[in-house]
């Protein structure tokens, strides 16, 4: 939040721009990742409002991409992989419904949604879930690409399968602004908190 979202939230606050938290509750997503679809039945009606009405609605081609990603980062048993995927699509479907509801409430507004790259890369994830809700929506994906030197697009070694509408080139943060020990500590605290959290 501090590095990626806070500057924009502060900008929005100071310019009176409305902001919505589009994602699903982290606690609910975590427990879906542990228990699967059955966890939904344990939620109170107020808790169910914190996730999509159809949290497990399938997103074409996304499962293959997600499983390929998991294979690269860690080996999980099949059941755990499936539950991780269910948690992931709960996030994407919830963000899509939140965006769509914001558009229904304010159709004259442009909506800017921020998310991690995986959620919108190649128009999958949240983008595909939003298109399912309304195929006529005009959705554009803007993807940041970190580069050492600004080059022409042809000289960049971009993934040829990347199918996003726009990319913008950003230089990495200066070394003095990147505190690796702080990042490690923050991630460790996040994972410890996650492990300690209990599900119903």
Placement of each model-derived feature along the sequence:
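A substrate-binding/cap region within the structured catalytic cores of diverse enzymes
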Residues: 1-102
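Structural recognition of the beta-strand scaffold that forms the well-ordered cores
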Residues: 18-22, 111-114, 138-143
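Generic local-structure boundary detector
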Residues: 28-33, 39, 62, 67, ...
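Membrane-water interface signatures at transmembrane helix termini and the short loops
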Residues: 84-87, 95-102, 108-128
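C-terminal regions of proteins
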Residues: 103, 119-200
């Amino acid at each position: 939040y501090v590095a990626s979202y806070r500057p924009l939230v502060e900008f929005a606050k100071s310019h009176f721009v409305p902001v919505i938290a589009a994602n699903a509750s982290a606690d609910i997503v975590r427990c879906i990742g542990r228990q699967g679809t059955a966890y939904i039945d344990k939620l109170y009606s107020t808790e169910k409002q914190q996730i999509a009405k159809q949290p497990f609605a399938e997103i074409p081609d996304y499962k293959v991409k997600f499983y390929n990603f998991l294979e690269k980062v860690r080996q999980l048993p099949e059941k755990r992989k499936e539950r991780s995927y269910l948690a992931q699509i709960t996030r994407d479907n919830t963000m899509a419904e939140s965006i769509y509801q914001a558009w229904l409430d304010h159709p004259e507004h442009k909506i800017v949604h921020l998310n991690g790259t995986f959620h919108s890369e190649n128009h999958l994830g949240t983008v595909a879930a939003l298109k399912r809700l309304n195929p006529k929506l005009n959705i554009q994906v803007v993807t940041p690409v970190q580069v050492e030197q600004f080059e022409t697009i042809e000289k960049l070694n971009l993934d040829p399968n990347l199918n996003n509408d726009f990319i913008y080139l950003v230089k990495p943060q200066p070394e003095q602004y990147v505190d690796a020990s702080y990042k490690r500590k923050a991630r460790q605290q996040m994972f410890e908190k996650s492990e300690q959290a209990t599900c119903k």
